[in-house]
Amino acid sequence: VLGANEEFNQSLEKAGRATGLSSSHARDLARGTLISAARLLDQTNEEPDELIRKVASPGGTTEAALNVLCKEGAGLDELVLAAVEAAHQRSKELG
C-alpha cells in the first residue's frame, strides 16, 4: 500500500514529539529507523522475523515497542490487513 511507510513515519515523528523530542530529532529518528529497516531487508536474504530477532534485545526498548505493535487482536497485523482489504475493495470498485 503506497503511502503506508510515509504514514508510519509520520506516526513515529508525532510519537517522538509527544514523548519530548524536538521536531528535528523526532524526524531524524523516525526516518533513520525506516531507512535502516529497509536497508536491512534489501541487503540481506533474511526473513523479517529473523531480522526482528536480531534487532530486538530481550528486555530492551525495541522489544517493548514490538510488544505493543504486535499485540494479538489489536496490533499492527490487524491494521495492515484492514488497510489492504480496504485498498483491495476499492480497486475492485474502480475496476
Residue positions per predicted region:
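Anionic-ligand binding region
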Residues: 1-27
